[in-house]
């Protein structure tokens, strides 16, 4: 059995980095799997439910903004990936990771695949779970801080996000290790 692993949320200035691990059922295929960035929001949300219903096993995990600031975004991403793999109810024989690096600490044979979210269904499914879950987090953060527009820009460094920071400052969930946030706090970069 093969598990696909992918992440969402490395680039934003706020919130957690989210990883998902998925083992698909070869006898219960899911149509339309692709890199989450190539799908509409509506299609991702539909597949989010279908993946959870049809996969043999799936797990979503995260590393929060504090862990990102303590470890750095790469190591926090690897932490979230390890947590996602550890959270699977079935242990896979192999783990396919989207990207060019393998997280340390996964005891199962891993293979890094650049562009794997577009070429391997297991990674595509993980990409969708991670992206939709993180987008849901941003919608909740938007309810908590409606002046920031998190539901729209998802925490990415957009003009609207920078304007909100300039007017309202940063929120607790901002990643203080990121240069734009440090500048807003007048911390040396």
Curated annotation (Swiss-Prot):
Protein's cellular compartments: Cytoplasm
Residue numbers binding a divalent metal cation: 6-7, 98
Comment on bound cofactor: Manganese or magnesium. Binds 1 divalent metal ion per monomer in the absence of substrate. May bind a second metal ion after substrate binding.
Substrates-to-products reaction catalysed: Endonucleolytic cleavage to 5'-phosphomonoester
An individual GO BP term: DNA replication, removal of RNA primer
Co-factor requirement: Mn(2+); Mg(2+)
A GO cellular component annotation in the UniProt record: ribonuclease H2 complex
Keywords assigned: Cytoplasm, Endonuclease, Hydrolase, Manganese, Metal-binding, Nuclease
Residue ranges annotated for the RNase H type-2 domain, each copy included: 1-189
Enzyme class at the top of the EC tree: hydrolase
InterPro entries associated with the record: RNase_HII, RNase_HII/HIII, RNase_HII/HIII_dom, RNaseH-like_sf, RNaseH_sf
Molecular function terms, GO-annotated: manganese ion binding; RNA binding; RNA-DNA hybrid ribonuclease activity
A Pfam family the protein falls into: RNase_HII
Predominant subcellular localization, coarse grouping: cytoplasm
The family this protein is said to belong to: Belongs to the RNase HII family.
Function in brief: Endonuclease that specifically degrades the RNA of RNA-DNA hybrids.
Name of the protein: Ribonuclease HII
Gene: rnhB
